[in-house]
Structure formats: C-alpha cells, structure tokens
C-alpha cells in the first residue's frame, strides 16, 4: 500500500483494486467490464457533469473535487460525518470490569487493512511502554496483512477482533489515546467517536482530518514511522482538551448531518 500511494494516483489504485477483486473474488459482471473499458477517471467525469449539488464531507474534500475536475461553476453543501451522541455519551458509559486490563491503552478501532496502515503503527510504536489495542477484523483480501501485523507486534499489542458496536463506548472511555494513521481519512468515524468520549486522538494528515479536528488532534504522516511515534507519545502525555469533545458535540451530531443534507436538497428545489 505504501508503494502504491507513492507511485500511483488514487484513480489508478482504484482501477487496480477492481481488477484484483475480479481476479481474486471472481467479481465480474457487465458493470465491471463497462468500468474497465471506460476507466475510473472518465466515469467519474460523467458523474460529476451530471451533479446539481455536491454533498462532500468537508470543504477540503470539495476543493479536491474542484481541482481534480477543473470545476468552476458548482453548488455544494458540506455534509459532515457524525457521531451518535446518545450512544457515545461519556457521562452515561460505565466501563465493565472485564476490560479494565486495557485501561489507558492506545486504541485503534478500524478494519485491519493496508489503507488503515496498522502495520506502520506497530512498527512505529515498538519499545514504547504502553498497551496497544486493535479492534476490528481483517478487511476483504487482507487476511495476510492481518497475519503480518500480528507477527510484527510485540507482547504489549493486543488484537481483539470484532467487538460489538454497543461495547465500543467503553473501550473509548478507558483508552488514553485513539489512533488512525491511515493513508486517507474524511475524517474517520472512530476518531469522532473517540474524541467525543474524551480520548486524545492521533490522526493522519492525509485527507480532511484538519477540517474536523483543527488544532485539537495530534497529526502524523502515515509513511513516517517517527512521525507516528512522536504523535502517539505527545497524545499519551497530554491531558485531554475538553474543547475537542465540545467541538464534536456542537458540529458533528447526526442532526447536523441531516440539516446539511436537507439544505442540499433545498438548493436543488430552489434551482428548478
């Protein structure tokens, strides 16, 4: 994945992923053949040209679309990713004794796959004295990657596999740090969930994370092990800044997402 990100564009990577799924999973249909014949970028352009209102997850995501397709005249409403504040309610979550062993861990909640970059996280944090907990199952076609992560991991790294979503608030509450050092995030739902549960977050600089978390997150470069390590240490040693959870509660509830989506539809109606 690191090699692909360095030498290929996102559209080229997506094209190769479709070919890989066709070969490895026998995923071949008329749609697949149409896609392969026309190409990723050309089909994207057709879709973009037909759009009345864009609903990106952030202003920076919209800027990338504009840059990629040279858009000059367009409507858009930024529709944020969000968190369920009823489920992820810090004051009403009680941590079960059965998971107290993981108290003050560095947590990563995500599928285990190349794009999420767990292998580089594990390489970066070797010899650090903290407990590291990975929650999530291997992504499709990433079983070998998962095994490589486990082989690389020292004894203070724990893989818990898939955990029921209702139990995640407990893990966020007991964790000291949550990390998503992915190759790209917009911004990563687990980072939002961890932040609203008053856990310091380490996030990738790739994507739209800074639109969401501003100066309250600890940023890292996914291809730089020292950058990941420094961010983890800084986040672990720092007290939690309540302004981060306040920001999530103010701007990134599902109600905010619904209102922004409605605004987008209203713009379409207003243009007709």
What are these model-derived regions, one by one?
Residues 198-203:
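Short hydrophobic beta-strand element within catalytic cores of glycosyltransferases
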Residues 11-54:
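Membrane-proximal helix-turn-helix segments that form the acceptor-binding/catalytic region
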Residues 55, 98-116, 122-129, 133-135:
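Conserved donor-binding/catalytic core segment of Leloir-type glycosyltransferases
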Residues 217-225, 233-238:
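Conserved acidic donor-binding segment of nucleotide-sugar-dependent glycosyltransferases
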Residues 66, 82-103, 270-272:
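Acidic anion/phosphate-binding donor-loop and adjacent secondary structure
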């Amino acid at each position: 994945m690191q090699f692909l990100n360095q030498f290929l564009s996102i559209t080229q990577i997506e094209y190769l992923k479709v070919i890989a799924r066709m070969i490895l999973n026998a995923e071949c249909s008329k749609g697949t053949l149409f896609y392969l014949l026309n190409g990723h970028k050309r089909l994207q352009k057709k879709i973009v040209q037909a759009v009345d209102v864009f609903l990106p997850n952030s202003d920076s995501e919209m800027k990338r679309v504009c840059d990629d397709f040279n858009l000059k005249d367009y409507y858009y409403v930024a529709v944020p990713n969000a968190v369920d504040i009823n489920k992820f309610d810090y004051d009403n979550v009680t941590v079960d004794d059965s998971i107290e062993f993981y108290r003050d861990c560095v947590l990563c909640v995500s599928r285990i796959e190349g794009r999420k970059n767990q292998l580089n996280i594990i390489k970066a944090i070797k010899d650090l004295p903290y407990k590291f907990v990975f929650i999530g199952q291997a992504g499709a076609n990433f079983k070998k990657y998962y095994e490589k992560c486990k082989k690389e991991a020292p004894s203070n790294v724990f893989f818990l596999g898939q955990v029921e979503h209702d139990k995640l608030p407990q893990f966020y509450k007991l964790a000291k740090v949550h990390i998503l050092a992915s190759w790209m995030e917009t911004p990563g739902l687990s980072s939002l969930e961890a932040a609203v549960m008053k856990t310091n977050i380490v996030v990738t600089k790739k994507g739209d994370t800074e639109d969401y978390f501003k100066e309250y997150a600890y940023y890292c470069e996914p291809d730089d092990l020292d950058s990941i390590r420094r961010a983890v240490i800084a986040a672990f040693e720092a007290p939690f800044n309540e302004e981060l959870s306040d920001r999530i509660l103010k701007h990134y509830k599902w109600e905010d997402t619904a209102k922004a989506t409605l605004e987008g539809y209203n713009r379409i109606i207003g243009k007709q």
